[in-house]
Amino acid sequence: MEKGYSKWRKLDNAALAFPLVTDKNDTRVFRFYCQLKEDVNSAVLQLALDQTMEKYPLFQAVLRKGLFWFYLEHRDIRAVVKPETEPPCSRLYIPDKKSLLFQASYDKNRINFEVFHALTDGTGAMHFLQELVQDYLILAHPQADLPQIEHAEEITHGDKEEDSFSQYYSSDIPKDKEKKKAAVKLKGEKLVHSDMHITEV
């Protein structure tokens, strides 16, 4: 594991609820994907994932339950690319199962990245997918002289382990008294057990 990272870390405050409320009907998994102009080469995608994981060592972790809190523990488990066979956002975290909390998969010309929400938020997942796709395209087209992804700021080890909720939240800040508009409620027949249904357009 890259120097500068601990072998375990507590979940930040914003992520603590996810392990408690997840089940087979509410997986707390979300997905980003990138659609290419060509079919995905699975062998090249695996090499790209290996490279990307070197930049994201915190993702090589399993979720464990301690006496007082959940925590992420580093494990030498290789992330393996798979063809897409399961429904989108299928369950990734199963209590007491020592498995990674994300999955990279592919289907025809699409690269999928699914992640359990306790591991990272949308920003972290988007950065990971950007790196993965960049590494894939560079490996697949070595003569193309493709541009590198430019991030606004270089992310340090401390930034990746930072609990932003604790750093920026304060109960002393007065709440906004402005009346909020009612949320939009979707119409239609509900699925049995509140199962998820996904429609792509």
PLM regions with names:
Residues 1-167:
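Non-catalytic N-terminal regions of enzymes
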Residues 165-201:
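Flexible, P/S/T/G-rich "lid" or insertion loops adjacent to the active sites of thioester-utilizing
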